[in-house]
A protein has these predicted regions:
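Extracellular jelly-roll beta-sandwich "head" domains, especially the C-terminal globular C1q domain
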Residues: 1, 25, 48-60, 68-114
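Polar, enzyme-active/binding microenvironments
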Residues: 20, 42-43, 55, 63-69
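Glycine-rich, low-complexity segments
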Residues: 1-24
């Protein structure tokens, strides 16, 4: 779903570091700051993010995990119809992931400012 080497619209800042045998989780390495793990729980279609080895979900990310982390939108379970994501380096240095479902784009996570 994400590809083996990089996400679409690769900026050079994000790469897929590891994919487990079943393809159920993805480790992204942000070369400047830290590591993010996106876990897709297939039976619920929810995404979980791991930052600095602390498991967090949706808008419940505590600010203590990383000083620069942003709280993601409440739209976290995007359903089964998810296309490949795009990632962008924003003007403020943060990384944004966008997922497209059937109707519109949601900003899933924007974490780790440079």
């Amino acid at each position: 779903m994400f590809g083996s080497d990089s996400v679409s619209h690769d900026t050079g800042w994000i790469k897929v570091k590891e994919i487990d045998n079943e393809g159920s989780y993805y480790i992204f390495e942000y070369r400047v700051c830290a590591k993010m793990v996106f876990v897709h729980v297939r039976n619920t279609h929810y995404w979980t993010v791991r930052a600095n080895n602390a498991s967090v979900t949706e808008e419940k990310i505590p600010q203590s995990i990383a000083p620069s982390i942003r709280i993601p939108m409440t739209v976290c379970g995007l359903g089964a119809n998810i296309s490949s994501p795009s990632c962008f380096i924003e003007k403020d240095g943060s990384v944004s992931f966008y997922f497209k479902n059937e109707t519109s784009y949601f900003e899933a996570y924007a974490c780790y400012t440079v």
